[in-house]
Amino acid sequence: MLEDNERVDHLIKEGYEIIQNDEVFSFSTDALLLGYLTEVRKNDKVMDLCSGNGVIPLLLAAKSTQPIEGIEIQEQLVSMARRSFKLNDLNDRLTMHRMDLKDVYQTFQPAQYTLVTCNPPYFKMNQNHQHQKEAHKIARHEIMCNLKDCIEAARHLLKEGGRFIMVHRAERLMDVLTELRHGKI
């Protein structure tokens, strides 16, 4: 089940296990906060964007019996998420799609979800001090998707009156608010 440099960490509160790999990218406090502070309602249909190794779907699965989906572009992270779902016997409820956020328009009908969560890359692509590892760059910097892409994907996926819950850095608050306004969310 584990590949090179992988380990199993425990989500103690939820009673779940998750496969992580520091060579690719491991979740941090911001992902935990997003998962812990997001309310999943009884009839929610849930999609997690920029899903990484699937930590948000796992955290949300502990709060609900609803099916939860995620979208992630990096193949290795998708594999880790899928294996974590299997490890926790959640394959019947959790699904991870390997795809570019820009492809949601061709893959998903509009207005199908009541809750969309997102832990996007925080740093602009041209920011100095990018990580040396490509997987870390993609997870942390707006290389494969930017804030606008995340918000537009959420808008496409959300039903009228649906909720979009995102975590981001305080210094990007004005960017977030501007894109939310442009995206009409």
Specify the residue positions occupied by each region the protein language model found.
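Short beta->alpha junction loops/turns
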Residues: E23-V24, Q74, R169-A170
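Class I SAM-dependent transferase core
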Residues: L2-R41
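Short loop/edge segments at beta-strand edges and connector loops
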Residues: Q20, R98-M99, H168
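Conserved SAM/SAH cofactor-binding pocket of Class I
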Residues: Y36-C118, F123-H129
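Glycine-rich, phosphate-binding/catalytic loops in enzymes
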Residues: G35, Q132-A135, G183
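Conserved Class I SAM-dependent methyltransferase catalytic core
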Residues: M144-I185
